[in-house]
Amino acid sequence: MNIWLNMLTTTGLGAIIGGYTNHLAIKMLFRPHRPIYIGKFQVPFTPGLIPKRRDELAVQLGKMVVEHLLTPEGIGKKLTNEEFQKGLIHWAQVEVDKVITNEQSLRHMLEKWNVAHVEEEATRKIEHVITEKIHAFLAEYYTYTWEQALPHSVNEKVENAIPNVSAFILERGISFFESEEGKARLSKMIDDFFASRGTLLNLVGMFLGNVSVVDRVQPEVIKFLGQDATKQLLTDVLQKEWEKLKGRDVKELEAFVEKEMIVSSVLSAVKVEETVSKFLNQSVQQVCEPVRETIIEKVVPSAVAKGLKWGTENVESILNNLHLAEIVQQEVSTFSTERLEDLVLSITKNELKMITYLGALLGGMIGLVQGLLLLFLR
């Protein structure tokens, strides 16, 4: 009975000592959190291993992340993975579609994104661009003649239209002189003509009688205007004037119309502020609906593919510029010792328990062996 009690005692004590020793060793990894002093003498093994080496641990964790976890090769492989790319494109399509089908006004959406004074800025910038374009256009075209400035098609149309213009002018002239107003105007012109030519022609006019002269002149004027030769004459005159105009510099226009007046007229016709306001008051869905399918099916996949390609080609540079090792080091350095302990224990809790149990098992086995040795040595 005493033999079995001795063996049980040695085994139990060995298990307790082994288990507690391992448990204490594990605790000493983290505890105490601060050094303990007796007078000026620092107690050995204080603070615990991890609190004492926390800065070194932070540096090593940073190196481990950069050198073994988030490597350029690993990230590059992930970025070129076909399944990952498909998933990312699908996610991007869903998220973009949510934005472009939003029924909120474009103005409200921009304000939500903290884009302030967008209407004023857009109006100002558009007007500035239009003004700059007009000035650039005029600066270029003021160096041309009208023949150089006008498109060939316009020149052709004007030349083809000259005979029709001549015919129109003559038709209007005939209609005018056939009317009572035209006859009255012609009568006045005859009176003025005789009055300006002196006494002799005045006497002739009085002798012929005014009404008689008008009645004789009116048909001749109408007949003259209706002749083909007159039409050809007017066409030739207009053609010559058109040729003269084509040879003149566009810059001469500046003497009649100032640049700022042209700019002001264009801006007034375009109504930039009103157009921008109407555009911003539309819903995002209304604005994007005409191009929604193109954005979702073409733009998004293309943008994601190009982004991933760029990311793959520049992943090493990106990681270097991110300084991940420093980020990890700084973050770990800010952890309290308690948090660091909880973090390690949350990962290794089961394993550390098994180490404690293993210590108890080994201690128990050693105690059993000791009990057996004592039994045989008696």
UniProtKB/Swiss-Prot annotation:
Disulfide bonds: none annotated. Keywords: Cell membrane, Membrane, Transmembrane, Transmembrane helix. InterPro entries: DUF445, UCP032178. One of its GO terms (cellular component) is plasma membrane. It is found in: Cell membrane. Pfam families: DUF445 (PF04286). Its main location: membrane. The chain crosses the membrane at residues 357-377. It is a single-pass membrane protein. Belongs to the UPF0754 family. This is UPF0754 membrane protein BC_0879. It comes from Bacillus cereus (strain ATCC 14579 / DSM 31 / CCUG 7414 / JCM 2152 / NBRC 15305 / NCIMB 9373 / NCTC 2599 / NRRL B-3711).
